[in-house]
């Protein structure tokens, strides 16, 4: 049986990886890594994988990672990527392939689409998942921000879903983490200011990577966009110890 394992390799720091992930990367027949189409530079997941796998076991798979809309270019990239992985299995029947993804493979990851399309092409494929540490967890740890306590709820929100839904999430959940804002950072900060939540928020960009930036959201320039790899945690308002129980 062909086996495809989606492995989370964490947000950036090569030590933020499970032992299981490290062991798999060290022994897999091949490690596929997603890279942006046409970008010759080292991919984000690839940079971490290089700490655990020799370069000759790494195969780059191109995706339309920077496309903002879901269109034909993205569809073609998924099909081409799945064809590449399926062709590898055709040449290595019964082998195990790892697909490395930043953070966790079940959180906004290209792995979801890839695995479904490869299974469609091959008919039979054992798909497994190894969880990874997310940027949200790294930022919470680095800033000493307990995400949730007692009966508090937590929402993970993609800013690409729009400012109105962000506002709604802030009303309905105790803690809200925002992903995928980058150029939408001024919009996210405006909502936080309007809802009185700016002082509850911390910001982290390029966590564990060169150029990392971690600061209270109220210290950010309200008009300047952030990089794609940026995360905001809006922490719950809390009373004293155990107040959320
Ligand atoms: C397509 S999602 C991938 C999420 C990833 N699978 C995870 O579990 O964290 C990309 C978003 O994750 C967040 N992110 C991932 N790595 C990050 C990092 N090193 N620093 C800050 N944010 C990061 C950003 O919000 C970015 O827009």
Which role fits each region the language model picked out?
Residues 29, 93, 144, 173-174:
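Residue-level detector of structured alpha->beta connecting loops
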Residues 11-14, 160-162, 182-184:
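Short beta->alpha connector loops
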Residues 30-37, 129-131, 202-205:
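Short internal beta-strands
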Residues 103-171, 236-240:
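Class I SAM-dependent methyltransferase SAM-binding "motif I" and its flanking Rossmann-like core
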Residues 8-9, 99-102, 131, 158, ...:
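Small/polar loops that bind or transfer phosphate-bearing groups
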Residues 61-63, 130-132, 159, 204-206:
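Conserved beta-strand termini and adjacent loop/short-helix elements that scaffold enzyme active sites
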Residues 1-14, 19-125, 189, 211-215, ...:
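Class I S-adenosyl-L-methionine
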Residues 4, 170-245:
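A contiguous loop/helix-start segment that scaffolds small-molecule binding in enzyme catalytic cores
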């Amino acid at each position: 049986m062909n086996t495809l394992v989606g492995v989370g390799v964490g947000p950036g720091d090569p030590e933020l990886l499970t032992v299981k992930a490290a062991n798999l990367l060290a022994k897999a027949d091949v490690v596929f890594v997603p890279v942006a189409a046409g970008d010759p530079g080292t991919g984000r997941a690839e940079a971490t994988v290089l700490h655990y796998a020799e370069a000759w076991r790494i195969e780059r798979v191109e995706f339309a990672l920077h496309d903002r809309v879901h269109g034909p270019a993205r569809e073609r990239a998924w099909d081409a990527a799945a064809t590449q992985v399926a062709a590898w299995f055709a040449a290595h029947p019964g082998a195990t392939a790892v697909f490395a993804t930043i953070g966790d493979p079940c959180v906004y990851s290209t792995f979801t689409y890839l695995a479904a399309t490869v299974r469609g092409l091959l008919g039979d494929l054992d798909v497994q998942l190894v969880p990874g540490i997310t940027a949200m967890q790294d930022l919470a740890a680095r800033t000493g921000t307990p995400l949730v306590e007692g009966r508090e709820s937590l929402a993970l929100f993609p800013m690409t879903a729009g400012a109105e839904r962000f506002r709604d999430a802030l009303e309905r959940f105790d803690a809200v983490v925002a992903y995928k804002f980058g150029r939408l950072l001024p919009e996210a900060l405006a909502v936080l200011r309007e809802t009185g939540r700016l002082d509850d928020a911390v910001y982290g960009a390029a966590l564990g990577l060169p150029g990392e930036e971690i600061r209270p959201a109220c210290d950010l320039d309200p008009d300047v966009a952030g990089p794609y790899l940026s995360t905001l945690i809006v922490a719950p308002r809390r009373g004293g110890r155990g107040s959320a129980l």
